[in-house]
Amino acid sequence: MNVLITGAGGFMGAYLAQLAESAGHSVLGIDTKEPETGTYTGAFDLCDVRDAVRIYETIAAFRPQRIFHLAAQSYPTVSMTHPFDTMQTNAGGTINLFEGARAAGINPIVVVACSSAEYGMVAAEDLPVREEHALRPLHPYGVSKVAQDLLAYQYFANYGIPTVRIRIFNTTGPRKRDDVCSDFTKRAVQIELGIRRSPMIVGNLTTRRAIIDVRDMVRGLWIAADHATYGEVYNVGSSNIYSGAELVEAIRPLIKVPFTLEQDPALLRTCDEPVIAGDTTKFRLCSGWKPEIELSTTISDMVEWWRNHLAPAAALSNSWARADEHQVVA
């Protein structure tokens, strides 16, 4: 089976490609950047989902039976300063993908990676949030994902393209960058390796997130193509919720040196949802899927990945320190 993955050069896309390849499928990944060395082994093309001509050509040539649409501008803070680019990538790119399938005369199963950011501010009594909850996003990124979500639905409703929309909740794991788990594990390992000194700089430690391992998430995306009802939308994530403070305490015993904390006001978002957690009952019932990897395992794997990734920088930093010390002694 031919499987097309947009955003394959990114964190989740590379894991999904590995899963599809391990099942014996022919995978083509596309992205605007090359995958990180050692994270992706399948066929890959540099292709921007905003480029309609390239998307049409790619789909017509590869003729996928399944498409996993993960390509996105996925940072809320970036969307605040680049709202047009965010909308063009997330909504416009989705249109190009579906129109490319229509132009090629194919009818692939399309799994669209939507977002929990679509819900925005949710009252405490409505948590964990269900799929039918009102969508009130708090930033252009969330708005762009609502547009993507509803565009995918209308391509099912109007053209019969078998589409499944997955509202993804906080996902992390080894190789992740620029989320709270990644930032905290990276900074802690930097302190351990002597690259930076304590205190560890943090932002808001009171926000709470349901956090799932990326390996569980991509398994859910794959299962969705087989078991979900076309045209439907599903929450996929963890049912376990953690505050930033709890994440720090999960990391602390894994680090070989003590460290303190210091809050940086620059890291505090002006539009940050206090709690993000979804009710995944609908997806679990239709698919039999459930998360299998404990947060402790995820955090431990992330710490180990950062140790390996940062070791060359630590060695260089230590060699400079020894050279400076030698000059002082001399």
Question: Where are these predicted regions, by residue range?
Answer:
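N-terminal Rossmann NAD(P)H-binding glycine-rich loop of SDR-like oxidoreductase domains
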Residues: 3-22
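NAD(P)H-binding glycine-rich loop region in Rossmannoid oxidoreductase-like domains
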Residues: 49-89
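Catalytic helix-loop patch of NAD(P)-dependent Rossmann-fold dehydrogenases
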Residues: 81-96, 103, 109, 117-165, ...
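NAD(P)-dependent short-chain dehydrogenase/reductase
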Residues: 122-128, 150-209, 214-219, 225, ...
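C-terminal "lid/loop" region of Rossmann-like NAD(P)-dependent oxidoreductases
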Residues: 199-204, 233-234, 243-249, 256-275, ...
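Non-catalytic, hydrophobic alpha-helical segments
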Residues: 217, 221, 236, 247, ...
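Amphipathic terminal alpha-helices
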Residues: 295-330
